């Protein structure tokens, strides 16, 4: 019998309601909404950021490109929450950003899951029913089976028989045998609104029978043999109910179920009849008819290999699907979820076709049969598709990935028909010489967590689930209901042995019996990364360490510490060998992931424990030693030996205290004080773990199988191989531990810094040093402290650890793991007895169990989650994110409007400057007299003032655009950058003032042959250099009034400046120009 158990059947019972429930809960499937045509645009948005998108940037990009009604605020909020969850799901490593490679890899991984057997909710195996047998005699082979779900009837039609038999579908009990027609019965259909069963025959009649007592109600004559029939109740406005029949004349007839009269044939015309002038229709006998109510579409298949789609309201043709080479006589519709809706067809071809009704091409072929198929069926509410051929080969497919999950060979020479039932058992019933029943493999005990032992149970506070580890699978359970959510199978070829959560609780690190280590995504079961393999030795324990706490994703945060970058992430593994591997989680090469191999032990390493918020981990070995290792320096320290040199099986840090507990193979529990830094680790106490033996009913010590600590109430939980759980109270022990004066240098400095001023030693009134009395007190305190340190074994006593309670017989076999759920004040246990239970710290009563049975109400699951608080937190986070997005959008809009205004002003200014009339400049100024031209020197060409000014005017527009906003800053104390509009205005003012100044100088020097030539390019460069020095080098200098040179250049007519003052570049390096009194 298969090891797959009732878990999947329970899953599939829920799957049909998953989509509707998710809609009611407001969950959105982002991947379903993702437009493939916009993927290239989205990729560009990722590339522009350079370092990836933060969560607010990611949400903005996705909200822009997702297909939904942007005016629907409620829909936008739901999508925003879904995008936040998606970001956290993809950002498994927690670096706070998402690059395009991560996003695209996530999408690809969803597709790869179609080819991965570890995909969740794996279909269960079928096996022949041991309880249901067909004991009836069949004179001829069974030609066809028809199942009526509402009646739970199975109508059996035998080859060339005028009778039909009615069975109880659940028990195979024969109810009726009806003498129905004069010739062979071909098909049967149930009409629920009239409580009738219709049968068709070779005698050219359709008979209608009362479904309760099979009394004939009406006989309808037909012109041709009707090979198939199908009832349909359409969800259109009038909600008509029809009986469709397909004849050997390739015509489809319509009958009104209320009047049982034919409808749709008027004057010999039938819309389904294919004429030479028509493009659609059938030219051969009809093989099958299928109404798809959700699409108001009628699908017909014929022996001409065509599949036709018709509008349900008008019965006009919609589409024709071509691809089959031979006749088609079986159709079915899969509606497992909106993402998996598809049409399936089968016939004389050896493959079943999968269609999307919106396109004409097939989307997949279900291959694997070597003979013509007899049909294709979908199990309602499940992802299962069944195909069978005439040779008796049956295949079970998963419609989510189109993989063949199981192959069944029915023991018969020729298989003719089969049906599937929608009851709890999901039976498949085959018709050959007799009926063959196949059903799900059911566990004998439905109160189990799995048919195989439960090795670990872990609590995930982020995803609100419990995770159980079994030798061949990992199961995920909803913490709110105790129901099974997902099953991940075939993760490894070897048996799974250990697993541990990462610090962000988004993935699992898993080890197996062959020494393999890999990570699994908890959300979808995808295997993500492998690590260096141990030498074919079973992995005994794993732990995960991050150099700092998991970063919370801040909205728009720029702190490097918040994005998670620069973290050191390590995976520590041990196995049935003496070496402990320290892996680099970020290593890209699995074969070289190990950064360090710790070989301090001399035998098998059994257990690991990480001290939270530190760099230390402890390892316990069969050599009797406990080794403390620093994950950064790899410094190692072996704990002091005790008088009990037995094999160490378990080790645990009592976080947040500086204490460690270990158990050995003889039932002794040892307590140590562990100090950080260079201080020594000290042995404190040993206590025996005792319980009552089942064999002789005597109290004796037993090995401890697992240790767990609850820091909220200082309770230590211990389990044994008898299935008991014992609780010890460590309050007194931990109080004494705090009283010990720690000689750690760093902790001494911290304590001294926190010492109140009134507790400091008294100082002499005339000096700095303490008095002699103070020194004696300090010496005495040190002596007491040292005395305590030397006699710690006497200071700590057995009575410091108080017995609280023992759960006798919590399990029927040895307990493998204890998981503390602090926020609910509960703990969970797993065992070799294949069970997992939940317990309360208040009264130590069972609060529920993780079970396979369908009836979860009997489980009495009592854990309650504060959903409102989680919703409020999610809503607050979303509102905060939306405010950030709105603020950024407003800034973008203002910047765009400013750019448009600047571009408009630049255009207007350029137009005015080009059309402005410029007066001719002469040597005599405004009189207009021409000056004699003087030839330029031959050696060096010198431009005249007029030519120079014309050249500078041509550069005017370019200079305006080259101005740096920081160089025109008029208030350097505030360090505000001018807008582009102010840039252009100030640049224009500067050039106009320089132009006026040039005119003044030229007029004052009109007696000279050549006017003063001002190099405007040099002027502006010198000006820019001056401003750069002020802004960037002296930005911390505080000045009362530090005005730009632009304000120092008042109207040149009101200044008395000697000629030649601006003839050198160095003249402009002085920022402040003294003003003279007005003339």
Curated annotation (Swiss-Prot):
InterPro entries: EF-hand-dom_pair, EF_Hand_1_Ca_BS, EF_hand_dom, WD-EF-hand_domain, WD40/YVTN_repeat-like_dom_sf, WD40_repeat_CS, WD40_repeat_dom_sf, WD40_rpt. It is found in: Cell projection, Cilium. The keyword Calcium applies. WD repeats lie at residues 137-177, 180-219, 224-265, 281-320, 323-365, 368-407, 449-487, 600-639, 643-682, 699-738, 810-849. GO terms for molecular function: calcium ion binding. Residues 1-15, 922-943 have a biased composition (Basic and acidic residues). Keywords: Calcium, Cell projection, Repeat, WD repeat. Residues 1-27, 883-943 are annotated as: Disordered. Ca(2+) binds at residues 91, 93, 95, 97, 102. Pfam families: WD40. One of its GO terms (cellular component) is cilium. Residues 78-113 form the EF-hand domain. Residues 16-25 have a biased composition (Polar residues). The keyword Repeat applies. Associates with components of the nexin-dynein regulatory complex (N-DRC) and the CFAP184:CFAP263 complex. Associates with components of the nexin-dynein regulatory complex (N-DRC), a key regulator of ciliary/flagellar motility, and might act as an inner dynein arm (IDA) hub or linkage. Belongs to the CFAP337 family. This is Cilia- and flagella-associated protein 337 A. The lineage of its organism: Eukaryota, Sar, Alveolata, Ciliophora, Intramacronucleata.
């Amino acid at each position: 019998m298969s090891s797959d158990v009732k878990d999947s059947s329970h899953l599939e019972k829920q799957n049909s309601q998953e989509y509707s429930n998710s809609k009611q809960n407001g969950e959105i499937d982002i991947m379903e909404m993702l437009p493939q045509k916009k993927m290239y645009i989205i990729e560009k948005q990722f590339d522009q950021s350079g370092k990836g998108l933060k969560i607010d940037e990611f949400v903005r990009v996705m909200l822009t490109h997702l297909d939904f009604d942007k005016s629907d605020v409620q829909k936008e909020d739901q999508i925003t929450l879904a995008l936040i969850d998606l970001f956290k799901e993809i950002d498994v490593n927690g670096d706070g950003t998402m690059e395009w490679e991560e996003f695209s890899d996530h999408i690809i991984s969803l597709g790869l899951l179609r080819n991965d057997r570890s995909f969740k909710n794996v279909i269960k195996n079928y096996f022949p029913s041991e309880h249901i047998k067909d004991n009836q005699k069949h004179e001829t082979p069974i030609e066809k089976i028809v199942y009526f779900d509402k009646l739970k009837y199975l109508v059996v039609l035998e080859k060339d028989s005028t009778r039909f038999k009615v069975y109880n579908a659940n028990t195979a009990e024969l109810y009726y045998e009806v003498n129905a027609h004069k010739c062979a019965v071909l098909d049967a259909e149930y009409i629920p609104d009239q409580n009738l069963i219709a049968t068709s025959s070779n005698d050219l009649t359709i008979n209608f029978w009362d479904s309760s007592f099979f009394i004939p109600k009406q006989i309808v004559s037909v012109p041709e043999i009707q090979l198939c029939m199908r009832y349909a109740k359409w969800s259109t406005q009038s909600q008509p109910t029809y009986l469709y029949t397909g004849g050997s004349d390739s015509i489809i007839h319509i009958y009104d179920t209320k009047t049982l009269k034919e409808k749709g044939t008027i004057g010999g015309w039938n819309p389904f009849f294919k004429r030479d002038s028509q493009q659609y229709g059938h030219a051969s006998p009809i093989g099958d008819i299928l109404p798809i109510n959700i699409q108001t579409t009628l699908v017909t298949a014929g022996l001409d290999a065509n599949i036709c789609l018709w509008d349900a309201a008008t019965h006009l043709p919609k589409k024709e699907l071509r691809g089959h080479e031979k006749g088609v006589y079986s159709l079915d519709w899969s509606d497992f979820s909106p993402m998996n809706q598809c049409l399936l067809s089968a016939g004389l071809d050896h493959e079943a076709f999968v269609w999307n009704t919106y396109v004409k091409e097939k989307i997949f072929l279900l291959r694997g049969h070597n003979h013509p198929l007899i049909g294709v069926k979908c199990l309602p509410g499940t992802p299962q598709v069944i195909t069978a051929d005439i040779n008796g080969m049956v295949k079970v497919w998963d419609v989510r990935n189109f993989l063949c999950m199981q192959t069944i060979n029915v023991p018969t020479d020729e298989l003719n028909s089969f049906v599937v039932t929608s009851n709890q058992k999901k039976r498949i019933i085959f018709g050959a010489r007799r009926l063959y029943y196949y059903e799900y493999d059911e566990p004998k005990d439905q109160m189990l967590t799995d048919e195989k032992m439960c090795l670990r149970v872990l609590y995930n506070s982020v995803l609100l689930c419990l995770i159980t580890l079994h030798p061949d699978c990992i199961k995920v359970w909803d913490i709110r209901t105790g129901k099974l959510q997902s099953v991940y199978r075939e993760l490894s070829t070897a048996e799974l042995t250990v697993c541990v959560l990462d610090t962000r609780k988004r993935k699992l690190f898993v080890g197996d019996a062959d020494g393999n280590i890999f990570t699994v995504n908890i959300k979808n079961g995808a295997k993500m990364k492998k690590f260096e393999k141990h030498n074919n030795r079973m992995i005994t324990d794993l732990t995960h360490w991050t150099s700092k706490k998991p970063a919370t994703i801040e909205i728009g945060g720029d702190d490097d510490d918040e994005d998670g970058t620069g973290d050191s992430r390590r995976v520590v593994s041990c196995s049935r060998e003496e070496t402990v591997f320290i892996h680099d989680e970020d290593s890209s090469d699995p074969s070289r992931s190990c950064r360090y191999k710790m070989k301090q032990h001399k035998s098998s390493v059994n257990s690991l424990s990480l001290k939270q918020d530190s760099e230390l981990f402890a390892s316990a070995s069969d050599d009797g030693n406990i080794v403390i290792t620093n994950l950064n320096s790899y410094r190692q320290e072996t704990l002091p030996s005790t008088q009990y040199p037995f094999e160490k099986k378990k080790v645990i840090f009592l976080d947040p205290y500086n204490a460690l507990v270990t158990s050995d193979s003889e039932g002794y529990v040892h307590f140590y004080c562990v100090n950080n830094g260079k201080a020594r680790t000290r042995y404190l106490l040993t206590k025996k773990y005792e319980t009552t033996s089942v064999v002789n009913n005597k109290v004796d010590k037993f090995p401890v199988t697992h240790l767990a600590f609850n820091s909220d109430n200082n309770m230590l939980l211990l389990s044994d191989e008898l299935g008991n759980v014992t609780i010890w109270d460590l309050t007194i022990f931990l109080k004494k531990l705090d009283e010990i004066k720690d000689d750690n240098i760093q902790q001494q400095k911290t304590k001294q810094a926190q010492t109140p001023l009134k507790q400091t030693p008294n100082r002499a009134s005339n000096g700095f040093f303490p008095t002699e009395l103070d020194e004696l007190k300090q010496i005495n305190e040190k002596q007491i402290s040292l005395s305590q340190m030397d006699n710690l074994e006497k200071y700590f006593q057995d009575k410091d650890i108080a017995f609280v309670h023992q759960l006798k017989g919590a399990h029927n076999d040895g307990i493998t793991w204890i998981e503390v759920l602090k926020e609910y004040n509960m703990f969970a246990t797993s065992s070799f007895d294949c069970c997992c239970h939940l317990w309360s710290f208040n009264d130590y009563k069972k609060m529920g169990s993780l079970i396979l049975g369908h009836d979860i109400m009997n489980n009495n699951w009592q854990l309650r989650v504060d959903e409102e608080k989680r919703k409020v937190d999610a809503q607050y986070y979303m509102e905060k994110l939306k405010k950030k997005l709105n603020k950024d959008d407003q800034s973008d809009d203002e910047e765009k409007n400013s750019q448009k205004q600047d571009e408009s002003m630049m255009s207007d200014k350029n137009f005015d400057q080009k059309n402005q009339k410029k007066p001719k400049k002469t040597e005599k100024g405004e009189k207009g007299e021409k000056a004699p031209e003087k030839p330029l020197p031959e050696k060096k060409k010198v431009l005249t003032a007029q030519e120079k000014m014309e050249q500078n005017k041509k550069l005017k527009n370019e200079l305006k655009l080259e101005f740096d906003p920081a160089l025109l800053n008029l208030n350097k104390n505030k360090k505000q950058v001018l807008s582009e509009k102010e840039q252009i205005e100030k640049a224009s003012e500067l050039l106009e003032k320089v132009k006026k100044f040039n005119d003044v100088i030229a007029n004052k020097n009109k007696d000279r042959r050549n006017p003063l030539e001002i190099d405007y390019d040099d002027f502006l460069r010198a000006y820019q250099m001056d401003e750069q020095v002020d802004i960037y080098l002296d930005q911390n200098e505080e000045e009362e009034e530090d005005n730009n040179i632009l304000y120092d250049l008042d109207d040149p007519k009101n200044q008395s400046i000697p000629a030649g003052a601006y003839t050198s570049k160095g003249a402009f390096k002085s920022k402040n120009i003294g003003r003279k009194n007005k003339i």
